[in-house]
Amino acid sequence: MAYPFQLGLXDATSPIMEELLHFHDHTLMIVFLISSLVLYIITLMLTTKLTHTSTMDAQEVETVWTILPAIILILIALPSLRILYMMDEINNPSLTVKTMGHQWYWSYEYTDYEDLNFDSYMIPTQELKPGELRLLEVDNRVVLPMEMTVRMLISSEDVLHSWAVPSLGLKTDAIPGRLNQTTLMAMRPGLYYGQCSEICGSNHSFMPIVLEMVPLSYFETWSAVMV
């Protein structure tokens, strides 16, 4: 998870987030090279006193600076499109969880079970135990099996919300009257934190999300107790 004064991104926990990190590094390198070239050209223009008074046109240079940006844009667009299609692909999810946003809490329903649903509220600061995180802990965590594809159906009861868990590369808008879906798969067990990422009112900052990814056997035990 994130920590104070962190310079980089959070560690990837899902295949999608790993792809996003690679794409970030790929794009950042291209931007760095372009910025360095532009800075070098500006430095040359400011330091040299020579001028090409006899040069009226440069067809070759114009051709290069037309084709080269097009190639660069293609190099950025192709990996981006690949990840977009990967994020939209849903193949035989093992579990479906319906998530509803409210002012200002989340409710969850495990649709594969008859009566497995609960609300998830933030734990107030004065009720936190030692070691728990301020503004990030909830009274009911979303327990999910690791290394399995889980489909999240996301909507809202009132205003716009956004269900986001950065370490899993997830951010899906919760829109009233509309059902959005996304998939997640965690490669390792642990607690993964997120927050509502759409300003939704005065208590927008107090809508944390906590996913507890556990082995399948633990999930089956938990679901049997909850039902």
UniProtKB/Swiss-Prot annotation:
This is Cytochrome c oxidase subunit 2. Binds a dinuclear copper A center per subunit. Residues 1-14, 88-227 are mitochondrial intermembrane. Component of the cytochrome c oxidase, the last enzyme in the mitochondrial electron transport chain which drives oxidative phosphorylation. The respiratory chain contains 3 multisubunit complexes succinate dehydrogenase (complex II, CII), ubiquinol-cytochrome c oxidoreductase (cytochrome b-c1 complex, complex III, CIII) and cytochrome c oxidase (complex IV, CIV), that cooperate to transfer electrons derived from NADH and succinate to molecular oxygen, creating an electrochemical gradient over the inner membrane that drives transmembrane transport and the ATP synthase. Belongs to the cytochrome c oxidase subunit 2 family. Mg(2+) binds at residue 198. The keyword Metal-binding applies. It is found in: Mitochondrion inner membrane. GO terms for biological process: ATP synthesis coupled electron transport. The gene is MT-CO2. It comes from Vulpes corsac.
